Amino acid sequence: MIIVTGGSGFIGSNIVKALNAIGRTDILVVDNLKNGEKFVNLVDLDIADYCDKEDFIASIIAGDDFGEIDAIFHEGACSATTEWDGKYLMQNNYEYSKELLHFCLDRQIPFFYASSAATYGGRSDNFIEERKFEQPLNVYGYSKFLFDEYVRKILPEAESPVCGFKYFNVYGPREQHKGSMASVAFHLNTQILKGENPKLFEGSETFLRDFVYVEDVAQVNIWAWQNRISGIFNLGTGNAESFRAVADAVLAFHQKGQIETIPFPDHLKSRYQTFTQADLTKLRAAGYDKPFKTVAEGTKAYMEWLNR
C-alpha cells in the first residue's frame, strides 16, 4: 500500500494520478474534505481507501498497524502563505509532519514530503538548499523551514529514505479548490471565461517566479521513491519567468482579451517574493535528468485541460 496525505488536494491528487499511471491503485488517500469541492480531484482516479486526516493522525500516534506500506507521500498541510494563525500552522504543518516522520522511521517506510520555496523568504539569488540561505517571510514559510531543519538533524541516522521537496510556484490541473491561492494561470483563465480582461498587478513584467508544472512535480516524487532518494531538494524548473509571460500564454490560447493592470496591494509589499528561481544543482546531481516544461508549454497544456 501507498499512503498519500493531502491526496485529494492539488499536488497530492497529481501524485495519485502518477501512481495510477505506473499501475498502483493500492493507495490510501488521507485528507480533510471539509472543503467538499476537493472530491472532484479523485473522481477519475483509482484508490483503495480514504481516511479522514484526524482519524489518521490518531492512528499514527497510537501506532496502529496499516499493513505493509511501500511509501508515504506527505502533501497534506495548510498551503496558504497568507494564513497568519501561527498555532494552527505549526500544529498542521510541523507537529503533524514530525509524527508522520517518526512513524516512517520506526518502520523504515520511505517518506517524501512537501517543503516550500517560501523557506527562502525575500532573497533574489542563491536559492540553495542550505540553512544560511533560508529566511522565511511568513508563518507558513517558517513552519516548512522548521520541519526541514528537523529533518536535517535526523537524515544522517535515517535507515530509510527521507526526502523533502521545496516546491516553487506549482500550477496546473486539480487546483481549482484553492480559491485565492490557485495559480495566476487559473485566475486569468477564469477572468477570460467571464468575459473580463485578465488582470495583473502593476509591475508584473518584473516579478519573476519559477513556475513549475504540477505533472513534472509528481514525476519527480515518483522518481525519488523508485530510486530511494534522501535529502532536501529544490523542485522548480531552474528558470524564472514573469507573470506577464503566464498571461501571454493564456491569451495565446484564448486568442482574445488584453491585459489590465491593477494596483499592488499594500499589505503584501513587505511579504511578497518578487523573484524565485530554483537552483537545481543538487537535484541534478542526485540523478534527475528529465526536462521541465516551460511556462509556454505548461500553460498551454493547462489551458487545454481547463477548457476541455
Swiss-Prot record:
Residue numbers binding NADP(+): 10-11, 31-32, 38, 53, 75-79, 92, 144, 170, 178
SUPFAM superfamilies hit by this protein: NAD(P)-binding Rossmann-fold domains (SSF51735)
Keywords of the record: Carbohydrate metabolism, Isomerase, NADP
Active site (UniProt): 140 (proton acceptor), 178 (proton acceptor)
Reactions catalysed, as given in the entry: ADP-D-glycero-beta-D-manno-heptose = ADP-L-glycero-beta-D-manno-heptose
EC top class, as a word: isomerase
E.C. code: 5.1.3.20
Cofactor: how and how many bound: Binds 1 NADP(+) per subunit.
Disulfide bond positions: none
Pathway recorded for this protein: Nucleotide-sugar biosynthesis; ADP-L-glycero-beta-D-manno-heptose biosynthesis; ADP-L-glycero-beta-D-manno-heptose from D-glycero-beta-D-manno-heptose 7-phosphate: step 4/4
Pfam families attached to this UniProt entry: Epimerase
Membrane listed as a keyword: no
Residues that coordinate or bind substrate: 169, 180, 187, 201-204, 209, 272
Cofactor(s) annotated in UniProt: NADP(+)
Cited InterPro entries: Epimerase_deHydtase (IPR001509), Heptose_epim (IPR011912), NAD(P)-bd_dom_sf (IPR036291)
GO biological process entries: ADP-L-glycero-beta-D-manno-heptose biosynthetic process; carbohydrate metabolic process
Recorded family membership: Belongs to the NAD(P)-dependent epimerase/dehydratase family. HldD subfamily.
PANTHER family in the cross-refs: ADP-L-GLYCERO-D-MANNO-HEPTOSE-6-EPIMERASE, NUCLEOSIDE-DIPHOSPHATE-SUGAR EPIMERASE
Subunit structure: Homopentamer.
Function noted in UniProt: Catalyzes the interconversion between ADP-D-glycero-beta-D-manno-heptose and ADP-L-glycero-beta-D-manno-heptose via an epimerization at carbon 6 of the heptose.
Name by which UniProt lists this protein: ADP-L-glycero-D-manno-heptose-6-epimerase
Gene: hldD
